[in-house]
Amino acid sequence: KQMEKDGVEFNLGAKVKSVKDNHVYYELNGEELDVAADAILMAVGRIPNTEGLNAEGIGIEFNKRAIAVNEVMQTNIPNIYAIGDVNGKVMLAHTASHEGMVAVAHICCDHADMNYDQIPSCIYINPEISSIGLTEAKAKEQYDNVKVGRFPMMANGKSLIEGTTNGMMKVILEGETGEILGVHIYASHATDMIGEVSVAMSSELTADEMIHAIHPHPTVNEALGETFMSAWLGKAINSL
C-alpha cells in the first residue's frame, strides 16, 4: 500500500513472455501487454546448487532437486551431512548457519533438532519487513482460537522522533494460552527487532510474559510490547 502511494504500479498474476530492448512483454487476464523501462530486475527464485558435488554418484538420496536430510541434517549416508541451500529447506544465510550448529552438535554426540517453524525472515527495504512463525490465515487454519493484535508505528515515540512512522506490527497468538504463533513487523529497524521474538518463541514465552518484559523508552521495539497488549488484552496503552 505504501509503495502504491509512492507511485509504484503492480501487475500481479502477469506472465512474462519476453524481454526485448527496453520493453517487457507480458500476458495479463488473457491480454497481451507491454511496458517500457530504463532497468529490469528479474527475481526468478532459487534452486539448490548441487553441481559438482557428485552427491548422486556416491548414493546420496535427493528430494526433488535438493539433498534429503533428517532433523539433524544427516543424509541417508549417516556420516555425511548437508546444510544450507543444497538441502532446499529455507534458503537463508542464518538458517544455514544454524543448520551447521545442529549438524556439528550431532557429530559431537549432542542432539538438537532443527526447527524450521521459528526462522526469522527479513526484507531489507524502507521501511524494513520481518516476520517469524505463522501468518494470520495459517494460524486460523491450524488453531480454533486465535487472537490478533496490531499496533501502528505512528503511535510509537521513537518513530515520531525519527520521522519514520510508516508501518505497523502484528502479533498472532493462540487464544487460550497466549502461545506466540507469529509476529510480522513492517517498520524502521524491523530486521533488528525480530530477534527478540525468536528468543521468545524458542524459550516458549507467552504473551503475558512479553507484555511484562520492560522495554526502554523511547525505542522502536517498545512497540512490540504494545502489540502483544493489543493481541492479548484487546488494547494497547498508546493506541487507545
Could you say what each language-model-derived stretch is?
Residues 61-63, 110-118, 145-149:
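A short alpha-helix-loop-beta-strand transition element characteristic
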Residues 21-27, 60-68, 154:
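Short gly/ser/thr-rich secondary-structure transition/capping motifs
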Residues 5, 70-71, 174-175:
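Short, acidic, Ser/Thr-enriched surface-loop or helix-capping motifs
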Residues 29-33, 177-179:
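Short acidic/polar mixed-charge low-complexity motifs
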Residues 108, 125-135, 140-240:
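Flexible, glycine-rich terminal cap/loop adjacent to redox cofactors
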Residues 1-31, 89-97, 105-138:
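Rossmann-like dinucleotide-binding cores of NAD(P)H-dependent redox enzymes
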